[in-house]
Design a protein with these regions (language model features):
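Basic, Lys/Arg-enriched alpha-helical interface segments
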Residues: 1-57, 61
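Enriched for short, Lys/Arg-rich terminal
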Residues: 66-95
Length: 95
């Protein structure tokens, strides 16, 4: 099992997603959705190669779908680097 690390961009994405969730759905639902990302991060760290390669979007990236958002990550030895969490935004703008 690898460890995972969040990029600053991914941390900012989580904050943005949580704030949006609180405004749109309330704190309870926003917290549940926020916590689901960490469940996905654990799953990614356990089986990183089970997620699709999206090198056609960005070299060496893989994607895990979590709810309505996609987690983009890279495998760097024993570290999974969570690079960004993208929802309906333009991929070219975010990645």
């Amino acid at each position: 099992m690898a460890n995972y690390r969040l990029s600053n961009e991914a941390k900012n994405d989580l904050i943005r997603i949580h704030q949006y969730g609180v405004r749109r759905f309330g704190i309870t639902q926003a917290d549940k959705y926020f916590n689901s990302f960490f469940e996905c991060f654990e799953l990614i760290s356990q089986r990183p190669f089970s997620f699709e390669s999206v090198s056609y979007i960005k070299k060496d990236y893989r994607r895990c779908v979590c709810g309505v958002d996609s987690i983009y990550f890279k495998i760097n030895g024993n570290i999974i680097e969570i690079m960004a969490i993208v929802g309906r935004q333009d991929l070219n703008e975010k990645l």
